[in-house]
A protein has these predicted regions:
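Central antiparallel beta-sheet cores of small beta-barrel/beta-sandwich binding domains
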Residues: 1-77, 85-103
Length: 103
């Protein structure tokens, strides 16, 4: 599994600017994610699909905020850093900035 650990990054859009953390873990052979954004109630998230390709992970998910729309996340992990984006309905691709391992 790629990207196991706790990571932080920044996101800047016209609706939200800030930092968050995501814990990526092995949930009995499938990917598990816990997302924390200080000061924000994180909506319910359902992971529909995860594809691993080398050091990249691509995930498709849905959220209670837009229940009939797919979100996509792609991240490429190095030892202690990552780059990537989240594709949000209506907004398009939003870059994940300053991705780094914190635990």
């Amino acid at each position: 599994m790629v990207g196991i650990g706790t990571w932080s990054c920044r996101v800047d859009t016209m609706f939200f600017s800030g930092s968050g953390t995501v814990k990526v873990f092995d949930d009995n052979g499938k990917y598990g994610f816990n997302l924390d954004i200080p000061g924000v109630k994180v909506p319910d998230i359902e992971i529909k699909e995860v594809i691993e390709n080398g050091n990249k992970v691509h995930a498709v998910l849905t959220s209670s905020v837009m229940p009939n729309k797919d979100f996509e996340i792609e991240a490429e992990f190095e030892e202690n850093t990552f780059t990537g984006y989240i594709k949000v309905p209506i907004l398009g691709k939003v870059k994940l900035k300053d991705g780094k391992r914190i635990a």
